[in-house]
């Protein structure tokens, strides 16, 4: 059985996330998704809109996903040690170096192949920031009726 591991924030689920997870699932028999902890997201990106438990629940509810787990708070490789994947899948925009991941895993006794997926689609809803900006741009239109009531 080939176990695939994918990782991400998954703050506001969008079509890009679904496509990423579908493609990751095709690479093996089981897909385990690691959802970044709130503290990790705040340190590396921004304060998440959805908390880690909600994000994990949402991801685990997706059809391609067999299991979703929260990442380790201090050491991402501890999660890799727990999951023991055969393949780690990276999205086109994830800022990790494939060779560095493979080397660190090798040092920890884990033989893993790291695969970076290509960009898929170019929808204006294929990114959390794009969705947030679209909502902000349209908030007046969306709630104008409520304000006038």
From Swiss-Prot:
GO biological process: FAD biosynthetic process; FMN metabolic process
EC number: 2.7.7.2
Domain of life: Archaea
Keyword rRNA-binding recorded: no
Known pathway: Cofactor biosynthesis; FAD biosynthesis; FAD from FMN: step 1/1
GO molecular function, one term: ATP binding
Pfam families, sorted: CTP_transf_like (PF01467)
Obligatory cofactor(s): a divalent metal cation
Uppermost EC category: transferase
Description of how the protein assembles with itself and partners: Homodimer.
Function: Catalyzes the transfer of the AMP portion of ATP to flavin mononucleotide (FMN) to produce flavin adenine dinucleotide (FAD) coenzyme.
Family affiliation: Belongs to the archaeal FAD synthase family.
Name of protein: FAD synthase
Gene: ribL
